[in-house]
């Protein structure tokens, strides 16, 4: 199921801009103190490092991802999510000519 709306949040107004603008996100904090980020990845192939474990929820568009230690690219599209271990990394790619990948990153 795709998250369409998050109520009762505080938003960091200045965007986090990564990879020369290919990934842009905003941090949010829920009423209970839970932190997440919401963002978009434009067509590109990128590598992210994780501190805490993450769940990447796709709310629109699609991507392919590859977890550290794997050779397999897996597709993820709206309504789907994938988990990334903490202290790891993952590759993500959004194909040129396709809609940007819109996501919510849930930190564990």
Swiss-Prot record:
InterPro entries: Ppnp, RmlC-like_jellyroll, RmlC_Cupin_sf. Its EC number is 2.4.2.1, 2.4.2.2. One of its GO terms (molecular function) is guanosine phosphorylase activity. The lineage of its organism: Bacteria, Pseudomonadati, Pseudomonadota, Betaproteobacteria, Burkholderiales. This is Pyrimidine/purine nucleoside phosphorylase. Keywords: Glycosyltransferase, Transferase. Pfam families: Ppnp. It catalyses: a purine D-ribonucleoside + phosphate = a purine nucleobase + alpha-D-ribose 1-phosphate; adenosine + phosphate = alpha-D-ribose 1-phosphate + adenine; cytidine + phosphate = cytosine + alpha-D-ribose 1-phosphate; guanosine + phosphate = alpha-D-ribose 1-phosphate + guanine. CDD domains: cupin_PpnP-like. Belongs to the nucleoside phosphorylase PpnP family. The keyword Transferase applies. Catalyzes the phosphorolysis of diverse nucleosides, yielding D-ribose 1-phosphate and the respective free bases. Can use uridine, adenosine, guanosine, cytidine, thymidine, inosine and xanthosine as substrates. Also catalyzes the reverse reactions. One of its GO terms (cellular component) is cytosol.
């Amino acid at each position: 199921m795709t998250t369409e709306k998050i109520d009762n949040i505080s938003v960091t107004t200045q965007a986090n801009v990564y990879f020369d603008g290919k990934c842009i996100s905003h941090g949010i904090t829920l009423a209970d103190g839970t932190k997440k980020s919401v963002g978009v990845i434009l067509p590109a192939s990128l590598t992210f490092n994780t501190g805490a474990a993450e769940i990447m929820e796709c709310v629109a568009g699609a991507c392919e991802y590859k977890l550290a230690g794997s050779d397999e690219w897996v597709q993820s599209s709206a309504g789907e999510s994938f988990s990334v271990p903490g202290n790891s990394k993952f590759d993500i790619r959004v194909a040129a000519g396709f809609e940007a990948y819109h996501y919510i990153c849930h930190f564990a």
